[in-house]
Design a protein with these regions (language model features):
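Noncatalytic carbohydrate-binding groove/subsite architecture in carbohydrate-active enzymes
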Residues: 294-419
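Substrate-binding cleft and catalytic face of glycoside hydrolase catalytic domains
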Residues: 178-200, 206-339, 349
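C-terminal beta-strand-rich structural cap/linker in extracellular carbohydrate-active enzymes
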Residues: 543-580
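Structural preference for beta-rich elements and adjacent junctions enriched in aromatics
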Residues: 652-942
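Mature N-terminal, pre-catalytic/accessory segment of carbohydrate-active enzymes
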Residues: 34-166, 565-622, 626-689
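Carbohydrate-binding surface patches
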Residues: 479-527
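Aromatic/acidic polysaccharide-binding cleft in carbohydrate-active enzymes
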Residues: 389-462, 477-479
Length: 942
């Protein structure tokens, strides 16, 4: 997911332009004085004895940092500094120190903070003068970090978005200490520098400046990914109304001139910089490609290729912008001039949901299939990350900062796993680092530029690189266990290393660790295995024979060992014991037919741990119901195995609201203290046989049981939607009544074909209804059921301006999991509007009507069975009285600034599970927080 899609930030991020007024001056505080005397007030600043705020340690030798308190006063001043030191839940030191400040001269007090091991620390200092006036109360952070690998590592995965605004010398020192091995862009290579006007190109003095900059990065052990920073100022295509645009806002006006600039940027530097990113986020009709189309981008890539490659065949051209963009644009099936890149870009901002792994594997497979060089340059994840403001807004600031730190290693590890399994090089650039300057997008800064001090994620990064650099990822240890990710490495010394973390679960947000998998990992043969937490704190020194380690969501535990990779693998799998508080994923399922004497309460039980379990499941039926038996053994359930346990219903009561709460209790054998309880509200979700007329009387739906979905905003505003479905020999019917205060519509497709229907008010109908999904590049992968599953069909209904009802095909066999763009070739199964009107159409019927008075939108859809041929065959072959199971889900999009956004049946009918291509848009699809994968069941009654 693009950061700009995620947070709507401006282009100054890419340009390296400092946003004015973003930050206050360097942190300081004034004493309590009258307003007219404010200019003469004393000032106080905090810093550390090492200006980076980072203290590398080696072996068991501790760091000895000092806090520097500088007081500047117009008159002589004395007082005290009260300080306290904390590291997560520990308080390793505190004290009070006196100070004396000479008049008009900065006076610095050095406060030793003790002997400290690797971790992230916070120092709170309160400075008070002798009169009792508080001059400063501030908390600043620093890191004690493990030693990182020195020198250049061109094959390293560890990159960083290092801001050009930041003071260069100290920023490079910070990056070097963190173990950063790649930076993105060369500050002295700007389009206007390379070609200040048509036909004129830079000369040796400017080239020498660029080469010196690159050499300086190399001196710090850091490689540079070259970047073409958009247009020359004189070569920007005007806007749609002829208005001038900024240099990043549109495609080049003269593409040939742009290609010459790119060639002249690369030619004198290609011996130092072999990899070049062609354009940042070239979203068609978006923020950097405002009037450009998909073919324009493909043309640009081809023209650059044809200009550069004859002379410099070893140069790698890196293109695209996201996995979905690469599939939709760069590799658009059947389109002209596809695949003129050596490697591709993705910007996977957001939580480390397993869909990041799914999408990266897809990215690699596309590159290998469709790049002109089979993706020889690998994958370049040139921006990704999380931020407290956007990803942890409901947590206290300090806790949110630790939340960001937790997400770093899982993000890298998921991408690294995809690269290792597909044998493709990958580089990953966390966004971003600026030591002392603000910029557009600095919510993602890993330093506090106001205080020039690191945040916890800096220590997490250094810990990761110190333990994983110079190591080759061998395999994932728990491919069947949804709770756990384990990554086995072979170090350069041949010894085994590993990283393990428990996954997070979505509970309406991904902020709360309590919602994720929590437990312990016990190693029963731990000799020679050293373990470290995600901030570098050592957990075990390798001398104990048995150790038990805590597992918390996204908190990576690293293992460094004296063992071979095979022996470490055995210690972490065969000889290990996992004890999770929620070892089973328990999901009461929807009823697939109207309630009657043959009904059962069905509960899906999945073992999410890496070990086989014996358990007992007891259910609590809805009020007024009786089932027998209530308790059923679930023995020998293997990792990743899912069973549906049926409880025959003896007595039931029909709910007018079609909502039934089923509770459950699970106990696991040999774990007497372990008890897992919960409940789920389930509904009857079935399609009876009915002849329906789209646009006809509502009474024809009277005896079709509706399902309901509810969305609630943070402010407590609640909206509900109801869905009814039916079928006959010609169509599958859906009727939806959606509460919506304000209708948000696109222009009709015939007016603007670039508008995405799923971004307006709309509903989506998603089906997993094809056994052979030949265009699903991940089918058959060992992790497919864990997190890679995609749907087969997706349809979107929306009301366009002018009262135009539209039904769009977003996905079906033959669409290659692409999204519609007007200048792409027509696919074997066309994307876009279907042949469907209210009264006729070969592919369906559709009527979307708006009731502004009652703030409701009604959707009536008839989908021809020709659009779901495999499901149609099953339904038609079913015996009278039987039920055909269908995997189906709906999504409601309430668009606009005041809308509720997306509401998913998959998150309301069950706990979501990560997948790959599921709901639209396909950028960000498949994550638990975007509906997850479609695996909810419905029944089609005959």
């Amino acid at each position: 997911m693009s950061r700009r899609k995620l947070v709507g930030l401006g282009a100054a991020t890419v340009l390296g332009a400092t946003a004015t007024g973003v930050l206050a001056p360097h942190a300081q505080a004034a004493g309590r004085v009258a307003p007219q005397a404010a200019a003469a007030a004393p000032t106080v600043t905090l810093a550390f004895s090492d200006p980076t705020g980072l203290y590398p340690v080696d072996g068991d030798a501790p760091a000895t940092p000092e806090l520097l308190v500088t007081v500047t006063s117009p008159t002589a001043l004395n007082g005290t500094v009260a300080w306290s030191l904390s590291a997560r839940n520990e308080s390793p030191g505190s004290g009070t120190e006196p100070f004396e400040a000479a008049p008009a001269t900065p006076s610095t007090i050095r406060i030793p903070l003790g002997s400290l091991g690797p971790d992230y620390y916070l120092v709170t200092a309160t400075v008070t003068d002798s009169a009792g006036t508080q001059l400063l109360a501030q908390t600043v952070g620093f890191g004690v970090i493990r030693p990182t690998v020195a020198g250049r590592r061109p094959q390293s995965v560890f990159g960083m978005g290092i801001r050009s605004e930041s003071t260069p010398a100290i920023t490079k020192q910070i990056a070097q200490r963190m173990g950063v091995k790649w930076t993105r862009g060369i500050a002295s290579v700007q389009p206007d520098t390379v070609s200040p006007r048509a036909g004129v190109f830079w000369q040796q003095p400017q080239i020498d400046v660029a080469r010196a900059e690159i050499a300086d990065w190399h001196e710090h052990g850091i490689e540079t990914l070259g970047g073409i920073n958009y247009n020359m100022s004189w070569n920007v295509q005007p806007g749609p109304n002829g208005e001038p645009l900024k240099l990043y806002q549109n495609r080049p006006k003269d593409m040939a001139a742009h290609v010459e600039m790119v060639y002249h940027a690369i030619a004198p530097l290609q011996d130092l910089v072999p990899n070049w990113e062609l354009w940042n986020e070239p979203w068609v009709h978006g923020w950097t490609w405002k009037t450009g189309d998909a073919q324009d981008y493909r043309d640009m890539c081809r023209m650059i290729w044809e200009r550069v490659k004859p002379e410099y065949p070893d140069v790698n051209l890196i293109g695209g912008g996201s996995v979905s963009y690469n599939r939709d644009i760069v590799y658009a099936q059947g389109s002209r001039d596809t695949g003129y890149i050596d490697g591709s870009v993705n910007h996977a901002y957001g939580y480390p949901d397993a869909t990041q792994y799914a999408m990266t594997k897809t990215q690699i497979k596309m590159d290998k299939l469709w790049s002109r060089t089979n993706g020889r340059a690998g994958q370049w994840q040139t921006e990704l990350g999380t931020a407290t403001r956007y990803n942890f807004p409901d947590l206290p600031a300090e806790e949110a900062a630790y939340g960001v730190a937790r997400t770093l290693a899982p993000t890298y590890l998921l991408h690294m796993l995809a690269g290792a399994e597909e044998d493709s090089p990958i580089r990953i650039f966390w966004f971003s680092l600026s030591y002392d300057k603000g910029y557009s997008g600095d919510d993602f800064n890993i330093y506090d530029a106001k205080t020039k001090t690191p945040r916890p994620v800096v220590v997490a990064y250094a810990t990761m690189t110190s333990l994983l650099e110079d190591s080759a990822l061998q395999e994932e240890l728990y491919p069947d266990a949804k709770s756990t990710w384990g990554f086995l490495f072979r170090g350069a010394d041949g010894r085994g290393r590993a990283a393990v973390y428990a996954d997070q679960l979505y509970d309406g947000t991904d902020e709360h660790q309590s919602a994720g998998y929590t437990g312990t990992l016990t190693l029963n043969d731990a000799h020679g295995i050293r373990a470290y937490d995600h901030l570098g704190r050592r957990l075990t020194d390798g001398r104990a024979s048995c150790v038990t380690l805590a597992l918390k969501p996204w908190e990576t535990v690293y293992f460094d060992s004296d063992l071979s990779p095979a022996a470490l693998r055995k210690a972490l799998t065969q000889d290990a014991h996992f004890d999770y508080t929620t070892p089973l994923h328990v999901s009461p399922l929807s009823f697939v037919k109207p309630l009657d004497s043959t009904s059962t309460i069905d509960v899906r039980v999945e073992n999410v741990t890496p070990k086989t379990l014996d358990a007992s499941l007891r259910i609590n039926p809805p009020q007024g119901w009786r089932v027998a038996p209530r308790t059923v053994p679930v023995n020998g359930i293997k990792p990743g195995e899912s069973r549906v346990i049926s409880f025959p219903v003896i007595e039931f009561e029909v709910s007018e609201k079609n909502r039934y709460t089923v509770g459950y209790d699970v106990t696991v054998a040999h774990r007497p203290a372990s008890r897992q309880s919960g409940s789920q509200t389930v509904q009857v979700a079935c399609l009876p046989f009915r002849h329906i007329t789209v646009g006809g009387s509502a009474s024809q739906w009277n005896d079709v049981v509706p399902v309901t979905m509810t969305s609630v905003t943070a402010a407590g505003d609640s909206k509900s939607s109801s869905f009814q479905a039916a079928w006959d020999d010609a169509f599958l019917y859906v009727r939806a009544l959606v509460e919506d205060d304000l209708q948000v519509s696109n222009a009709a497709f015939t007016v603007d074909a670039y508008k995405f229907p799923f971004q307006a008010d709309s509903i989506q109908l998603a089906f997993d209804a094809a056994a052979d999904k030949t265009e699903d590049l991940l089918a058959g992968d060992p992790h497919y059921e864990k997190c890679l599953r995609s749907i087969s069909h997706l349809y979107v209904a929306t009301l366009a301006t002018g009262g135009r009802s539209e039904l769009h095909r977003q996905l079906a066999p033959g669409t290659n999991y692409q999204t519609f763009y007007p200048t792409n070739a027509v696919l074997p199964t066309p994307l876009g509007p279907m042949d469907a009107q209210q009264a006729d159409g070969t592919e369906g019927r559709v009527l979307v009507s708006r009731d502004d008075a009652n703030r409701q939108t009604r959707y009536e859809i008839a989908l021809a069975w020709s659009q779901l041929p495999e499901l149609a065959a099953e339904v038609r072959a079913a015996r009278p009285g039987s039920v055909t199971r269908a995997t189906f889900a709906v999504q409601v999009q309430d668009a606009g600034a005041t809308g509720h956004g997306a509401t998913y049946w998959t998150t309301q009918a069950a706990h979501p599970t990560s997948g790959c291509y599921n709901f639209a848009p396909f950028w960000g699809t498949g994550a638990q927080f975007t509906g997850g994968r479609v695996d909810t069941r419905w029944g089609i009654g005959r």
